[in-house]
From Swiss-Prot:
Part of the 30S ribosomal subunit. Forms a tight heterodimer with protein bS6. PROSITE patterns: RIBOSOMAL_S18 (PS00057). Binds as a heterodimer with protein bS6 to the central domain of the 16S rRNA, where it helps stabilize the platform of the 30S subunit. One of its GO terms (cellular component) is cytosolic small ribosomal subunit. It comes from Enterococcus faecalis (strain ATCC 700802 / V583). This is Small ribosomal subunit protein bS18. Gene3D superfamilies: Ribosomal protein S18.
Length: 79
């Protein structure tokens, strides 16, 4: 017998940056940037975080700058 699919619409995630009216994403604000990085140190995609395209681009630039300055790790050794 074929299984029936139970589908429901997933609630859209809210853009944290737009919701909190953050105009400038500073690379020195590591607490904000850590919200958008996985435990392995990878940048989380938009579909996971719910950020808009423009804010995701700004986040990516800020995270990469923070990594180069040594404020954030490139990879995490936690297992």
């Amino acid at each position: 017998m074929a299984q029936q699919r139970r589908g429901g619409r997933k609630r859209r995630k809210v853009d944290y940056i737009a919701a909190n009216h953050i105009e400038y994403i500073d690379y020195k604000d590591t607490e904000l940037l850590k919200r958008f990085i996985s435990e392995r140190g990878k940048i989380l995609p938009r579909r996971v975080t719910g950020t808009g395209a423009k804010n995701q681009r700004k986040l990516t630039i800020a995270i990469k700058r923070a990594r180069i300055m040594g404020l954030l790790p490139f990879v995490s050794d936690e297992q």
